[in-house]
From Swiss-Prot:
SUPFAM superfamilies: EF-hand
GO CC terms of this entry: muscle myosin complex
Claim: Disulfide bond is one of the keywords in the record: no
GO molecular function: calcium ion binding
Complex formation: Myosin is a hexamer of 2 heavy chains and 4 light chains.
Protein name: Myosin light chain alkali
């Protein structure tokens, strides 16, 4: 895709803020997985798990993750699927 079509960091953060019920920069891991599967590229469960393993900070005690770090890592070192 052309860079213009891929979106930028701010675009991704704005989309994920829709799931940020506490408005504190975190969301449930399951919600992030749902957003990636439903709204983003056509990814299967295995590809999402690979993304999480490569780009995700651990969940906190309540199951929340900081999504801005995830997006930063994903954009700085994209995961390529065959």
């Amino acid at each position: 895709k052309k860079e213009k079509e891929q979106g930028c960091y701010g675009d991704f953060i704005e989309c994920l803020k829709l799931y940020d019920k506490e408005e504190n920069g975190t969301m449930m891991l399951a919600e992030l997985q749902h957003a990636l599967l439903a709204l983003g590229e056509s990814l299967d469960d295995e590809q999402v798990e690979t993304l999480f393993a490569d780009c995700m900070d651990p969940e906190d005690d309540e199951g929340f993750i900081p999504y801005s770090q995830f997006v930063q890592r994903l954009m700085s070192d994209p995961v390529v699927f065959d």
